[in-house]
Amino acid sequence: MATNFLMHEKIWFDKFKYDDAERRFYEQMNGPVTAGSRQENGASVILRDIARARENIQKSLAGSSGPGASSGPGGDHSDLIVRIASLEVENQNLRGVVQDLQQAISKLEVRLSTLEKSSPTHRATAPQTQHVSPMRQVEPPAKKGATPAEDDEDNDIDLFGSDEEEEDKEAARLREERLRQYAEKKAKKPTLVAKSSILLDVKPWDDETDMAQLETCVRSIQLDGLVWGASKLVPVGYGIRKLQIQCVVEDDKVGTDLLEEEITKFEEHVQSVDIAAFNKI
């Protein structure tokens, strides 16, 4: 019966319930809560939690010190102490936040007051619009009839003049002169010639071929844009040696096909011609 009665109780035995009910009542009476009051309410809630925790600790200590009480585990008390310490730290942090907010609000109030003092008391009046009358079309003055003497004077004036014609001729002459000088300068400028360095392998028929005579035959080829370079004999095998000769050619004048064709004309000494290396200069 006692348990059923406590389930439907309409009074509070704990003080914090009464405090919460009283706080909600006054908040409803005073209207919406500002940001600063919310911070203070949060701090007060933490303070009430701390007080409640202390009250519970005191009750537990009082119950454990009684005659029939048994010694409980020490871990519960340590947890409560840790929670109290954390709540106190949070309380200090909230107090610091509240102080910072109060300082910021005071600074804003000071700045607002200075701005209000520096601003002009009267508003700038809008400029009055002036009534503009519609534009009237101005008629040009009537031309007077020109006298014969004035007509003669007008005829004597050369509006275009011969000076402008002379200036046009001078400008055309200068333009032609500059174009001619530019063309001469461009013609004198040396043009870049694309050249290539080629290393040829000239192979004889057998080891009895006179390699000196073969080199003489190859160097006897004279073409526009062809310059022969160094040469040497490279052994191939079985006593046979090939002629390795270097040359520089102009790409527009001498091609590799033409060079091979001219060398292979010496059929008695030359078996074949191969390009060992080809580099652009």
Curated annotation (Swiss-Prot):
- InterPro entries noted in UniProt: eEF-1beta-like_sf, EF-1_beta_acid_region_euk, EF1B_bsu/dsu, EF1B_bsu/dsu_GNE, Transl_elong_EF1B/ribsomal_bS6, Transl_elong_EF1B_B/D_CS
One GO term under biological process is:
translational elongation
Summarize subunit and interaction data from the UniProt record for this chain: EF-1 is composed of 4 subunits: alpha, beta, delta isoform 1, and gamma. Isoform 2 interacts with HSF1 and NFE2L2.
Q: Where in this protein does the record put region Leucine-zipper?
A: 80-115
**Positions bearing N6-succinyllysine:** 117
Q: Which residues carry this modification: Phosphoserine?
A: 37, 44, 60, 86, 106, 119, 133, 162
Higher taxonomy: Eukaryota, Metazoa, Chordata, Craniata, Vertebrata
Native organism: Rattus norvegicus (Rat)
- GO molecular-function terms, A-Z: DNA binding; guanyl-nucleotide exchange factor activity; translation elongation factor activity
Q: Where is this region: Catalytic (GEF)?
A: 173-281
Q: What is this protein called?
A: Elongation factor 1-delta
Gene Ontology CC, one term: cytosol
